[in-house]
C-alpha cells in the first residue's frame, strides 16, 4: 500500500505565431501612447502580450491516498560463492484527485477584456469561445495514472574472500506514460482557446500533455569489499538510458541518458543490528536543437499546449545528489 501525489507550480507562456502577430499589431497601433485607433471596431491595447511573455501561473496538486501493489521475489544460492535473484513489482492504477488554480497576468486579462469590448472582438469571441479576460480560475481536477510495473534480476559472485561483484539488469514499463490527461470540473478559458489550434490535446475541460515515454532496460554493476568482519565498503554504477524519445524532450522532465554513481558502507553493530549508508550522484546534460521536440521548441502554429521555447536551441543540465541511511535490527 502506498501514497502517490503530483504537485506543480508553473509559469505559463504560449510562444505561438498568433501571439507574435498580436504583438506586431500592438506595435503598429502604438499602444504605448494609450490610443486605440480602430475603436470601437477593434481594440488590442488592453495589455501587452507576446510570444515570450508570461500569461499566468498554474498551480496543481493531485494525489491518491491509498494505492495497492504487490511484489514477488526469488533467491537461488546453489553454493556459497554464487547467488541469483529476481523481483517483480506490479503496476498501480490510480485515480488522482485534487485542486488547481490559474492566476492570469494583468496584461493577459486586460488584453482579452479590451478585445471583447470591441465590436469585432466580441463577435469573434462569441463564435470561437475565446477568453473573456478573467483574472483567475480555480476548482477541482483529476487524472488517471498508472504507476509502471518493474522487473529486476541479477547475480552476485564472491570472487575473493574479501571481494564480491554484482551485476543487475532492470526493466520499467514507462511506455504506460504516453500522456498525462487532466480533467477539470469546469470549462477553462485558456483551454477554450487552445482547443482551436490543438484539438487532439485540449477540450474546454481537459488537457493532454503528450509524453511518449518508452520502456527501458538498465544495467547496474557494483562491488563490495569486506574490510573486516563488521565493515563492508561498496561502490557501483547504474547505466540509465533515457526513457524520453528525442522528439519528446522537455524541461518539465529533463532526464536524459546518464550514469548514476554510488558509494556506501554497511556496518554490523552487533549480531542483530546492521547500519547502512550510501551517497549517489547523477548528472544529465541534454542539448536540444530548435524545432526537434514539440514538447519544447517546435515552431508549428498548432503547438500551443506546452511549447515554451519555440524556435530556440535549448540545453538542460540536471544534477542529483542522494543520501540514504538505514537501520535494521532483529527482535
Where are these regions (language model features)?
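Outer-membrane beta-barrel porins/channels
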Residues: 1-331
Amino acid at each position: 500500500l502506498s501514497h502517490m501525489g503530483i504537485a506543480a507550480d508553473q509559469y505559463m507562456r504560449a510562444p505561438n505565431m498568433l501571439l507574435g502577430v498580436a504583438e506586431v499589431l500592438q506595435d503598429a497601433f502604438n499602444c504605448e501612447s494609450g490610443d486605440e485607433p480602430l475603436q470601437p471596431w477593434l481594440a488590442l491595447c488592453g495589455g501587452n502580450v507576446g510570444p515570450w511573455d508570461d500569461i499566468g501561473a498554474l498551480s496543481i496538486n493531485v494525489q491518491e491516498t491509498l494505492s495497492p501493489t504487490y511484489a514477488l521475489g526469488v533467491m537461488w544460492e546453489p553454493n556459497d560463492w554464487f547467488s541469483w535473484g529476481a523481483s517483480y513489482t506490479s503496476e498501480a492504477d490510480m485515480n488522482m484527485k485534487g485542486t488547481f488554480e490559474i492566476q492570469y497576468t494583468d496584461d493577459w486579462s486586460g488584453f482579452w477584456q479590451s478585445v471583447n469590448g470591441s465590436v469585432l472582438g466580441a463577435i469573434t469571441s462569441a463564435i470561437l469561445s475565446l477568453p473573456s479576460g478573467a483574472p483567475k480560475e480555480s476548482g477541482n481536477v483529476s487524472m488517471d495514472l498508472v504507476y509502471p510495473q518493474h522487473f529486476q534480476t541479477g547475480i552476485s559472485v564472491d570472487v575473493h574472500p574479501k571481494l564480491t561483484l554484482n551485476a543487475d539488469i532492470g526493466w520499467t514499463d514507462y511506455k504506460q506514460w504516453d500522456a498525462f490527461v487532466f480533467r477539470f470540473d469546469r470549462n477553462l478559458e485558456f483551454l477554450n482557446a487552445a482547443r482551436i489550434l490543438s484539438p487532439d490535446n485540449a477540450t474546454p475541460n481537459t488537457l493532454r500533455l503528450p509524453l511518449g515515454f518508452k520502456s527501458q532496460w538498465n544495467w547496474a554493476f557494483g562491488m563490495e569489499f569486506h574490510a573486516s568482519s563488521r565493515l563492508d565498503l561498496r561502490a557501483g554504477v547504474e547505466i540509465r538510458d533515457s526513457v524520453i524519445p528525442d522528439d519528446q524532450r522537455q524541461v518539465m522532465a529533463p532526464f536524459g541518458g546518464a550514469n548514476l554513481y554510488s558509494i556506501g558502507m554497511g556496518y554490523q553493530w552487533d549480531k542483530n543490528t546492521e547500519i547502512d549508508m550510501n551517497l549517489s550522484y547523477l548528472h544529465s546534460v541534454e542539448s536540444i536543437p530548435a524545432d526537434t521536440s514539440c514538447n519544447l521548441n517546435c515552431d508549428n502554429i498548432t503547438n500551443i499546449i506546452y511549447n515554451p521555447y519555440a524556435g530556440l536551441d535549448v540545453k538542460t543540465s540536471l544534477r542529483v545528489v542522494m543520501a540514504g541511511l538505514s537501520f535494521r535490527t532483529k527482535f
